[in-house]
Amino acid sequence: MAAQGEPQVQFKLVLVGDGGTGKTTFVKRHLTGEFEKKYVATLGVEVHPLVFHTNRGPIKFNVWDTAGQEKFGGLRDGYYIQAQCAIIMFDVTSRVTYKNVPNWHRDLVRVCENIPIVLCGNKVDIKDRKVKAKSIVFHRKKNLQYYDISAKSNYNFEKPFLWLARKLIGDPNLEFVAMPALAPPEVVMDPALAAQYEQDLQIAQTTALPDEDDDL
């Protein structure tokens, strides 16, 4: 039995991507999750319980954050085992972090075959964007969802979680009925830039994929 008020529906979410892409910054935006996080010493990870209130009741994502281990090579299988969903993050101001996305995806699906995965391009608030919408095609080849995000401004924070919740519950009409308490924005996402990026993504989605066989 879940404790009183404890969400019955829980999912293990693994957050992966190169070091420095903003994974920890992203997960720390959710204030109650940050307050209630637990450290798993055996694996060297922090687990943040992020609760979202939906029209079908509360859902909890137990988000596993690597605490920077990925800087020392790959992650151990124990990190991935029993994951029910994942977010792969790269930094839109760093091309190499996008180039490494296929490696993270490969490690993930080797252990967790058919889980829903969201690809997130973080730091879109920074004007000097290197990885443009038209170059982001990996998700289309692998049937993942993609979102531009800006962790420091809270831009699109809830989008990956809403998409994953709909997939995991099997209800495309699932909605968040209240936003979780988020840390105040450290930067402001320019609304004109956000609108431009959304338009760029829509155009990119309808563009034919390049023919080359490489993963990117």
UniProtKB/Swiss-Prot annotation:
Residues 37-45 are annotated as: Switch-I. InterPro entries: P-loop_NTPase, Ran_GTPase, Small_GTP-bd, Small_GTPase. GO terms for molecular function: G protein activity; GDP binding; GTP binding; GTPase activity; magnesium ion binding; pre-miRNA binding; protein heterodimerization activity. Residues 68-84 are annotated as: Switch-II. Pfam families: Ras (PF00071). GO terms for biological process: GTP metabolic process; mitotic sister chromatid segregation; positive regulation of protein import into nucleus; protein export from nucleus; protein import into nucleus; protein localization to nucleolus; ribosomal large subunit export from nucleus; ribosomal small subunit export from nucleus. It is found in: Nucleus; Nucleus envelope; Cytoplasm, Cytosol; Cytoplasm. Residues 7-171 form the Small GTPase Ran-type domain. Residues 211-216 are annotated as: Interaction with RANBP1. Its cofactor is Mg(2+). The keyword Hydrolase applies. One of its GO terms (cellular component) is recycling endosome. GTP binds at residues 18-25, 36-42, 68, 122-125, 150-152. NCBIfam families: small_GTP. GTPase involved in nucleocytoplasmic transport, participating both to the import and the export from the nucleus of proteins and RNAs. Switches between a cytoplasmic GDP- and a nuclear GTP-bound state by nucleotide exchange and GTP hydrolysis. Nuclear import receptors such as importin beta bind their substrates only in the absence of GTP-bound RAN and release them upon direct interaction with GTP-bound RAN, while export receptors behave in the opposite way. This is GTP-binding nuclear protein Ran. It comes from Gallus gallus (Chicken). The gene is RAN.
